[in-house]
Amino acid sequence: MSNIVQKNDPVLRGKAKIVPIKEIGAMKTRELIEKMKIAMHSQKDGVAIAAPQIGESLQIFAIAGSLLKKAVKNYKGDENDLIFINPRIIKTSKDKKEMEEGCLSVRWLYGKVNRSTRVTLEAYNEKGKKIVRGASGLLAQIFQHECDHLNGVLFTDKANEVWEMTAE
């Protein structure tokens, strides 16, 4: 599965390390981001991926831009993948909603997780620029799911109900 680690790998349970600011634009970081994108796009249902999912304990996640273009109402960005380095959710709505989730590292299990309907995320992009981004709906759900990965939490830890589906 294109080097995507699975739920029993200890890297998924640790708190990922912060990427030093001076290393954000470094070749090593750029190569890691490229590996993440390749792994994410190797799966038809790949929506987003965090560095620990490819065995690297660093606070980075990527979201498939092509998915956002299709799935997020009024999405104004292009189809480039979005990169978030050292992300922190700085604000969450009190409104919560139970949402279905799956994960490339917990293959073929799905569940319902109670998530905030709106969040604000602070992070650095791959060029080292600090960004603050508000999100609702699917994008807010992805931000929360990926930040959980960076803190050693899998969606199955929070799910109210979990079921298995087969690859189709």
Regions from the language model: what does each represent?
Residues 1-144, 149-168:
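Active-site rim/adjacent substrate-binding subdomains
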